Swiss-Prot record:
PANTHER family found in the cross-reference section: MITOCHONDRIAL RIBOSOMAL PROTEIN L24 (PTHR12903)
GO BP term (any one): translation
GO cellular component: mitochondrial inner membrane; mitochondrial large ribosomal subunit; mitochondrion
Protein name as it appears in the record: Large ribosomal subunit protein uL24m
Organism: Homo sapiens (Human)
Transit peptide boundaries: 1-9
KOW domain span: 56-89
Length: 216
């Protein structure tokens, strides 16, 4: 198991009931500022969509159907399943100030606002137009997305993880630990202390005699 996977397991936080998901990851500083533990916010009603029926993933090319950027196409850079949100890179943006203090007005930066899954549609790679999709199975038994207009398969994109690694295209290098080496048992439990193990490995013999120790 890689270090990034271990860090991901360790970063899981226990969320309170009726937790309101947002753009910030759970447990981050911005999320704690918006969801303090002493405030109970109203639960948000979200349309239930199973993981099997969800069809939008990071890296997909979509077209926006509503809003000021309607008709524009872009790539999905973030998916928030708990709210059925998708974020399209560089589109549906608003500007906000960060780092504002009493003596400094802050820096204005663009920030993408999320869109509901019904406000975007996948782009058919054949004619570059928005299309409805449906899930089908290939002859090999693989479940794929198929355009209802052209019948073309829309494959899932290869999108990097938070650490920048694309698992499908990753090739182990000379400094990477293989799975076999990581799972190999090399540690032998022993009751000796570290000093005693070092002395045994270097052939050092202890000539001193231990004094009796009494515990009260």
């Amino acid at each position: 198991m890689r270090l990034s996977a271990l860090l991901a397991l360790a970063s899981k936080v226990t969320l309170p009931p009726h937790y309101r998901y947002g753009m910030s990851p759970p447990g981050s500083v911005a999320d704690k500022r918006k969801n303090p533990p002493w405030i109970r916010r109203r639960p948000v009603v979200v349309e239930p969509i199973s993981d099997e029926d969800w069809y939008l993933f990071c890296g997909d090319t979509v077209e926006i159907l509503e809003g000021k950027d309607a008709g524009k196409q872009g790539k999905v850079v973030q998916v928030i399943r708990q709210r059925n949100w998708v974020v399209v890179g560089g589109l549906n943006t608003h500007y906000r100030y960060i780092g504002k203090t009493m003596d400094y007005r802050g820096t204005m930066i663009p920030s993408e606002a999320p869109l509901l899954h019904r406000q975007v549609k996948l782009v058919d790679p054949m004619d570059r137009k928005p299309t409805e999709i449906e899930w089908r199975f290939t002859e090999a038994g693989e479940r794929v997305r198929v355009s209802t207009r052209s019948g073309r398969i829309i494959p899932k994109p290869e999108f990097p993880r938070a650490d920048g690694i694309v698992p499908e295209t990753w090739i182990d290098g000379p400094k990477d630990t293989s799975v076999e080496d990581a799972l190999e048992r090399t540690y032998v439990p022993c009751l000796k202390t570290l000093q005693e193990e070092v002395m045994e490995a270097m052939g050092i013999k202890e000539t001193r005699k231990y004094k009796k120790v009494y515990w009260y």
